[in-house]
């Protein structure tokens, strides 16, 4: 479905295009619906795959009830999203952050201004397109916002209708939040937190200039209705405010488990007093008033451009190449503590001085065997 807002005639689509006029005609046509196959709330709504340590991603089963409690929360007064708003639709549908814009936009009569991959990959075209989209709600990762701030035109003067920023998927740094407040002084910036296993996000907080001024790392918010956030040390809940441990999430946002994987489901999903709960593997603290602070991972998992990645899965995927004897993946961090890219340290099956050629061959040999966002951007070769 298109609203013909992109200033280009070169975009190619391999699917039928329905414009606004055609859509109105379709919706005005009476339809007969079969109500004999009703959907129950605990039935499967969608499956999203996340990284796994063995090289086999885990399929997270999210129910209709899970999803609707999230959407109802997004449309509540907490986020103050108005009806008929224009949402930026940049995160792909394979990324659960996309659920933060498609139903929250469409249910109250809003419009999704989707950025095709070709536009995102072409900075000049993207920077030209954005000020012409009349955007009101930004949904994306902090990394994407950092990219947009490379353009001088990404500011309140050029985009006066953009009043709401919704972030999830990776850490929102003080630097990014401060830059956005300088560019969009009248906008509201919301930081949210939640793994795929708990349906997109389970906590939120509006990041004000005062919060930026008083924190080295920004908090990730208070629990949504129907959810309890707690901090655990092993199998014991920590009740002392400010003490660090593993973040455990319980309540109506917790997914059904991992598809066809009862062993991993039993390891991460459990019940607290009969209520579904999930061990996140994230380290965190809770203030006395329930404000959650995320302190990073407790294992070898990272966030890269919003995607959750098991470093051991990257290793296992790399070692599927017949050119690699042994490999290890190492994240590269910037001064703000965010992962910028992955470095692969590789022992090749055969020594060569043409490392650039070997890297090209390895990439080609892994085509279809590793997700593009998991492919290291730098390869370093060792003899042992």
Please provide the spans of the model-predicted regions.
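AMP-dependent adenylate-forming
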Residues: 1-37, 67, 138, 188-191, ...
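Gly/Ser/Thr-rich phosphate-binding loop
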Residues: 107-110, 135-139, 149-219, 228, ...
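Short, well-ordered beta-strand segments
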Residues: 45, 61, 68, 86-88, ...
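Conserved pre-ATP/AMP-binding loop-to-beta segment of ANL
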Residues: 31-49, 56, 81-87, 93
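Conserved S/T- and glycine-rich ATP-binding loop of Class I adenylate-forming
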Residues: 44, 50-53, 87, 93, ...
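Conserved AMP-binding/adenylation subdomain of ANL enzymes
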Residues: 58-88, 96-136
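ATP-dependent adenylate-forming carboxylate-activation enzymes
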Residues: 5-7, 110-133, 139-147, 171-172, ...
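Conserved AMP-binding
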Residues: 44, 91-95, 118, 143, ...
